[in-house]
Regions:
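Conserved anion/nucleotide-ligand pocket segment
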Residues: 1-55
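Intrinsically disordered, low-complexity boundary segments flanking structured domains
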Residues: 4-11, 59-63, 75, 93-100
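Extracytoplasmic
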Residues: 14-16, 70, 106
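Generic structural "secondary-structure junction" signal
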Residues: 24, 57-60, 65-67, 77-78, ...
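Active-site-lining helix/loop region of Rossmann-like oxidoreductase modules
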Residues: 33-86
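Conserved functional hotspot residues or short segments at active or partner-binding sites
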Residues: 72, 76-174
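C-terminal regions of mature proteins
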Residues: 164-193
Length: 193
């Protein structure tokens, strides 16, 4: 990204990031890498890292994403979600002081045992947020203003409220993603596989 920032002149006239790049040998975008150290107490394993892009959207809703439990970013729930046998209770712990819905039993979904390949293939999966939104039936009260900052656009909330599917929402940004992929091509360090 820093090479692209320089190449596209995004910092303004005559400003450049000072870069030193040491490429990895035998690496491609398909290479699996296991983090030797958890990047955060709330991302304790690779499953949480792979689920993060989708589950972090709950930070902009009334739903818990499991902070203050043994499965942060690997489960989600709310005290009023119905139809689920999985439950968890967020507690104040190191790395998650006073998490949302602290000391409240939340009902929801455990994603910790999903096959890693399916999580990676799904990528930025909006179905979890859509599922919770429909289950809680709270309308606009489901979301906080932070949701738009997380998702990056203002139409996702509206489309969820209108009953659109994850595929319909993703179709809205498909062309933008393809344009970005073309724009970034000259700056890639590793082959796209």
């Amino acid at each position: 990204l820093a090479r692209m920032i320089n190449g596209e002149g995004w910092l303004g006239t005559k400003k450049q990031c000072k870069l030193t790049i040491i490429p990895c040998e035998n690496y491609t975008h398909a290479t699996r890498y296991r983090l030797p150290i958890a990047p955060s107490p709330n991302l304790p394993n690779m499953q949480s890292v792979y689920l993060y892009p989708a589950i972090c959207l709950f930070e902009g809703t009334c739903v818990s994403l499991g902070r203050g439990t043994s499965l942060p970013f690997q489960q989600y729930g709310h005290p009023q979600m119905v139809g689920y046998s999985h439950s968890f209770t967020p507690r104040s712990v190191p790395g998650a002081k006073h998490p949302p819905l602290e000391n409240e039993r939340c009902w929801g979904i455990d994603l910790s045992q999903l096959p890693e390949d399916s999580v990676q293939k799904a990528g930025f999966d909006l179905s979890y947020v859509i599922n919770a939104y429909r289950n809680l039936n709270r309308g606009d009260a489901f979301f906080t203003p932070f949701f738009e900052k997380l998702v990056g656009v203002d139409y996702v909330r509206t489309m969820i409220e209108e009953g659109c599917s994850a595929a319909e929402i993703k179709a809205m940004w498909h062309d933008d993603v393809e344009r970005f992929k073309q724009q970034r091509r000259p700056y890639l360090l590793y082959p796209n596989s």
